[in-house]
Every structure is written in structure tokens, then in C-alpha cells.
């Protein structure tokens, strides 16, 4: 009896010689190079949009992963349990090290290059873009909910005690962020594009060609490119004790490829929101 990845792979016009279990995916040696079989939780139309967007990025000079079609020209294949997968090119490389300022700079430049390309890709006029200030408000509500949960407990541990002491400061930061983001969104000065959606040290690699390359675009969505940059900075800063020199290096590297105006810089305030 076939294993689940083998059932999904037989839907494609290719010969597979070896399958290796990777991080949440299957690395496949095939007659046309290495492929990655990845579980997919979206619908077919979203997968088609992702495939078209990745093709656009590649045509515009960034050799990102491309998604394969099945024998029936579908994007999604299913295994014997009806779980969905997509098959894409495997871009081998070394992940960004959060201990290396050069790596973090390289990842930041790659993100800026990606954003330069994506801003040329037109979004449908009726597409929904997640509101930044509403997201900030939800995070504030979560902080209040957590505080109320701690208050109801008869005993608290050291972490919960520390959280309660810092609660007001974090909540005020979140409220200030939501207020500023609301003003920016109302001014219509932020321009939405497609965003990577999960740009961190695991999703940008240094390839054999000597270039940094974003990978794993499954969470790509319409939004504001500044959110990618802010989340990347947050991840790097968390790993480096919130060293402001790291933030400066990441911003400088990004801006060396893609400039940020005052509005874009101000929108990065949501990095201060509690997570």
C-alpha cells in the first residue's frame, strides 16, 4: 500500500527516485530536479493565485520556487486520506542565522527586492486587505483577556506575576500603535500589495548561487509590505535581546534596495504590539 506522499505524487507527470521527510514537507528527488511536496490548507483558487504570483516574481528577476501542475492541470493534489498538497521547486540553501549580522542584512535585502517586484503586481480592486489597526486592537483585547484570566486564578506563577506587573505598559503600547495605524489607514497613504506573510529566518536561504532567496510562500496574502519587514525585525530582535543596532542594520539594508517614506516608517510601529 502506498504511503500518503506517494499517492499525492503519482498525480504528477514525473519520476520520483527518493522521498525524504523534511520540516513539515517531503523533499523529492525527481528526474527534473528536487521538488518539495507541501501540505496545503487553502482552496484551489488561492493556490492558482499563488502560482501566478510566483511566476510573476520569477519573470521579474527573482528565482523563487514555482508550483507544479498535476496531470489534470490542477494545482492541488490529494492523498488517500483526501489531505491536500502542492508540489513546488525545492530551493536548497542555508537558513539565515540570527547570530550573524551579515545574514540578517542579506535576508533584509532579499525582502526588499521581493517587495519591489510585488508592488508591480496589480491587486484585484475588490480584494480584502487585513486592517492593521483592527489587528492591533485584537491584540490589545487578548492582553486584557489574559490579565482577567490571571486575576481569576487562586495562585499565580512567577511568569504570570511578572506579566501582571508589566500589563499596563504593554497595553498602552498596543493602544498607541492601534491609534497611529488607524490614522495611517484612514489617510489612504499605505499601499497594499501581496506580502510573503511569514518572512523569518527559516524562510530565507542563502543558495548555492550566492544569493539570498525567500522561500515558502504558502502564507502569501494581500496586505502591507511593511508588515513583512516588521515581523522579520521582530524575529531578529527577539533572538538578539532587542539590540537596537540589529534593527538599524536591518532597516539600513532594506532601504538600500527599497526606500521607505515617512508613512511606511511610521507604520512599523506595530512591531511594538504585544504578541
Write out the residue ranges for each language-model feature.
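All-alpha amphipathic helical-bundle segments outside canonical DNA-binding/catalytic cores
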Residues: 127-131, 262-268
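ATP-binding pocket architecture of kinase catalytic cores
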Residues: 33-125
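Active-site activation/catalytic loop segments of kinase-like enzymes and analogous catalytic loops
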Residues: 226-259, 272
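ATP-dependent phospho-/nucleotidyl transfer catalytic cores
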Residues: 18, 38-45, 96, 124-194
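Residue-level detector of conserved catalytic or cofactor/ligand-binding positions
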Residues: 267-275
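ATP-binding glycine-rich phosphate-binding loop
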Residues: 7-29
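Active-site acidic catalytic loop and adjacent metal/ATP-binding pocket
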Residues: 27-29, 67, 178-227
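Protein kinase-like catalytic domain
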Residues: 58, 115-119, 237, 255-258, ...
